[in-house]
Amino acid sequence: MENFDQIFTLLAEHEGIGLNLNILETGLLNILTLVGILIYAGKDFLGSLLEERKTTIVKGVQDAEDRLNEAQKRLNEAQKQLNQANLVISEIRNETIATKKVLLESEVFGAKKDLKIRFERALAMFKSKERQIFLEIKQQIISLVLKRTVIRAQQAFAPKERATTLINDTINKLEGDLL
């Protein structure tokens, strides 16, 4: 705060702030000479630094462009591989679907064939049972007819010889019908 007061005191005593146009008193020549010497003497040094910096920047830009081109090439190659992989996946899916269809058709055909064989066996077994039952019924009917005939013959014909002959004739006729 003291310095601030001193500045105002000095300004008040010297009649304010003014511009000094005397070149020798201001040291402007010294500053310009110093800048000129620095430019002349530092031109080679500063030029080489700027040239190195320029070379480094250009090289960095070229490296970045090379990396960009390389990355672009790898991206294109990866996209080609992706497209090829998608084609292979699509082919595999199509082959899988075709194989599934063939397997299903084969299974359906096998199931139909198996069902047909089972149905034919069941039908043959049914016909066999039907024939067997028919023969058993026929045998029972013949047996009943023979028993009735024997009973009627015994009642109608008292003598044994006549009855035996009639029974034998009837049995022979019935056996002939069965065969």
Swiss-Prot record:
One of its GO terms (molecular function) is proton-transporting ATP synthase activity, rotational mechanism. The chain crosses the membrane at residues 26-42. It is a single-pass membrane protein. It holds the Pfam family ATP-synt_B. Belongs to the ATPase B chain family. F(1)F(0) ATP synthase produces ATP from ADP in the presence of a proton or sodium gradient. F-type ATPases consist of two structural domains, F(1) containing the extramembraneous catalytic core and F(0) containing the membrane proton channel, linked together by a central stalk and a peripheral stalk. During catalysis, ATP synthesis in the catalytic domain of F(1) is coupled via a rotary mechanism of the central stalk subunits to proton translocation. Component of the F(0) channel, it forms part of the peripheral stalk, linking F(1) to F(0). PANTHER family: ATP SYNTHASE SUBUNIT B, CHLOROPLASTIC. This is ATP synthase subunit b, chloroplastic. It comes from Phaeodactylum tricornutum (strain CCAP 1055/1).
